[in-house]
Structure formats: structure tokens, C-alpha cells
């Protein structure tokens, strides 16, 4: 199973990286967090796998809105890290 997931993780990382290099420069920067949501996504997927990584990414994207103060928000080292989502 892990051997099947590794190419998928690489593909997702590639798609996100293409977004960072091609699409992101064309639109107004609006991510309120550091690291950016796309970099957060790559780190989360590599650290926790596809499903947990995508879940953390979705939660992060929902928090990245005009009413959020933003700031530094690193991917947790432990999926059960007690953070406010």
C-alpha cells in the first residue's frame, strides 16, 4: 500500500508546485499565513500521508479568510497536537 501511495504523494506535490510556479504569480497574493497554504499542504501531505494531509490542508484553507489575522502557522509535528482548528 505504501508503494502505491508514494507516487500519488509525488503527483500531488507536483501539482501543488506547478500551482506555485505558474498560477500563483498571476494572481494577487492573499494567503494570510506563513508558510503559504500551498507549502503547508505539501508539508502536511509528506508528513502525514494523503488523507490526513489533505484534511489538515482543508482546515487551513478554511482558516485563511479575510477575517483571519493570519500569522505563523506551521504543520503540527503530531496529528493530535492540541490546536484550535
UniProtKB/Swiss-Prot annotation:
It comes from the Bacteria. It is found in: Cell membrane. One of its GO terms (cellular component) is plasma membrane. It is a peripheral membrane protein. The keyword Phosphoprotein does not apply. Keywords: Cell membrane, Membrane. InterPro entries: Membr_insert_effic_factor_YidD. The keyword Cell inner membrane does not apply. Belongs to the UPF0161 family. NCBIfam families: membrane protein insertion efficiency factor YidD (TIGR00278). Could be involved in insertion of integral membrane proteins into the membrane. This is Putative membrane protein insertion efficiency factor. It comes from Baumannia cicadellinicola subsp. Homalodisca coagulata. The lineage of its organism: Bacteria, Pseudomonadati, Pseudomonadota, Gammaproteobacteria, Candidatus Palibaumannia.
Amino acid at each position: 500500500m505504501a508503494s502505491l501511495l508514494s507516487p500519488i504523494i509525488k503527483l500531488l506535490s507536483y501539482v501543488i508546485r506547478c500551482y506555485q510556479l505558474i498560477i500563483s504569480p498571476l494572481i494577487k497574493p492573499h494567503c494570510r499565513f506563513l508558510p503559504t497554504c500551498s507549502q503547508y499542504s505539501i508539508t502536511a501531505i509528506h508528513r502525514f500521508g494523503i488523507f490526513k494531509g489533505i484534511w489538515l490542508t482543508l482546515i487551513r484553507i478554511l482558516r485563511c479568510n479575510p477575517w483571519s489575522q493570519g500569522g505563523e502557522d506551521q504543520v503540527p509535528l503530531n496529528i493530535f497536537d492540541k490546536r484550535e482548528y
